[in-house]
Amino acid sequence: MPKEENALITLTNAGIRRDRKWLVRGITMSVNSGEIVTLIGPNGSGKTTTAKIALGLLGINEGTTSRKNNLRIGYVPQKLQIDWTVPIKVKRFISLTHKISDKEIEFALSLTNTSHLSDKEIRVLSGGELQRVMIARAIALSPEFLVLDEPVQGVDYKGEDAIYNLIEETRTKIKCGILL
């Protein structure tokens, strides 16, 4: 396990229970700057729950969690909850919930090779294009810690390879810790 004193996030024997059932238990891990940590397991094994614990979105019933103070986090959820009838263009979508400069948006779109999509509506994007735009949205926040939950879900084989290459390039260029 990586050095915990420099970790962006650390989980130690973390567990979360609903009613009498443990969703995950005994999770110990840390993520440092510039490293990629991948959660592997079948559907329903607790990967998303573990990611949400690391993000601080779910409280734990046992164990401990710690995060670097003022940690900047980017998050790409497994499923996007959006009203597809609302016409919203990519550039606006990226800055929808945070004040982000045009320069930051352009950098994120360029890094994810989606600059050509900036004036397209979200609802017309392919699965791979949407995933890359979602990653651009997270990158635009200049995260130190980036969490991507099932980043290649709904993407064809060729698109999967492109997204994994993008994740590696993101780690290299912005030096963030990444949890997949």
Predicted regions and their residues:
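Conserved catalytic motifs of ABC-family nucleotide-binding domains
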Residues: 142
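Conserved ABC ATPase "signature" region
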Residues: 14, 102-119
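Conserved ABC ATPase signature
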Residues: 121-125, 129
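Catalytic Walker B motif of ABC-type/P-loop ATPase nucleotide-binding domains
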Residues: 146-150
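Helix-to-loop junction immediately C-terminal to a conserved catalytic motif
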Residues: 55
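Hydrophobic anchor residue at the start of the ABC signature
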Residues: 135
